[in-house]
Amino acid sequence: MAALRFGPPPAELPAVPPSCPPGRWLCGTAGGSGGGPGAAPAPLASLPPAAEGAPSAQRRKRTSFTAAQLETLELVFQDTMYPDIYLRERLADATQIPESRIQVWFQNRRAKSRRQRGPPRPGAPAPPPPPPQRSPCGAAPLLRAREEHREWPPRAAGPPGSALRPHGGSGGAPAGPYPPRPAFPLPAGGGFSELGTEWEENAIGAFRAL
């Protein structure tokens, strides 16, 4: 009846568990001998409390800029969007802001500027290229060809005496549309024969005087 009321007798616990040192297992037992039902369990090692807010602790602290610092950074950004390390160091000395934070500020400012401009429109027409300038040497042959076209047909060059001979044709009419003009007026009454006779007489008279 006692066994049915109180259950089966408890099994004997091992003297020394394999995973626990004997000193800690036997600590606090009655009489310091053997582990029995009255043996006090060893206190468990306390774990460190879980760190609350670990991601927020690892997050970098946000830098707050004053109005004067923002004005200085904006002036430099209007001048150059990609400052080098030397310019960032000078800005760090002037604004008392770490150089790494200045570099991050310029990265964010460039991204903001691209968002404000928006993507380029694909259908926007490109500006036409400027017209090519013609060199003066290229215009000279064109002007020369125009002058030759105006004087067409060109006048034929001949010996000086050809201007005195009339062109052949019916009724003594000139053959071309541009008859040559005589170099000097012809003497009336056959002046050529009279001049030749007078010259011969003068020459004969001078020869006889010798």
UniProtKB/Swiss-Prot annotation:
Any single biological process term in GO: regulation of transcription by RNA polymerase II
Gly residues: bias regions: 29-38
Bias (Pro residues): 7-21, 119-134, 176-185
CDD domains registered for this protein in UniProt: homeodomain
A GO CC term assigned to this protein in UniProt: nucleus
MF GO annotations: DNA-binding transcription factor activity, RNA polymerase II-specific; RNA polymerase II cis-regulatory region sequence-specific DNA binding
Superkingdom of origin: Eukaryota
InterPro entries from the UniProt entry: HD, Homeobox_CS, Homeodomain-like_sf
Main location: nucleus
PROSITE patterns: HOMEOBOX_1, HOMEOBOX_2
Ranges of biased composition (kind: Basic and acidic residues): 144-153
Pfam families per record: Homeodomain
Region (Disordered): 1-63, 105-194
DNA-binding region range list: 58-117
Keyword terms: Developmental protein, Differentiation, DNA-binding, Homeobox, Nucleus, Transcription, Transcription regulation
Keyword Lipid biosynthesis: no
Biased composition (Basic residues): 109-118
Subcellular location: Nucleus
Low complexity composition-biased segments: 39-57
The keyword Disulfide bond appears for this protein: no
Functional summary from the UniProt entry: Transcription factor that play a central role in proper axial mesendoderm morphogenesis and endoderm formation. Required for efficient differentiation of cells from the primitive streak stage to blood.
Record-stated family: Belongs to the paired homeobox family.
Protein name: Homeobox protein MIXL1
Organism, as annotated: Gallus gallus
Lineage, opening ranks: Eukaryota, Metazoa, Chordata, Craniata, Vertebrata
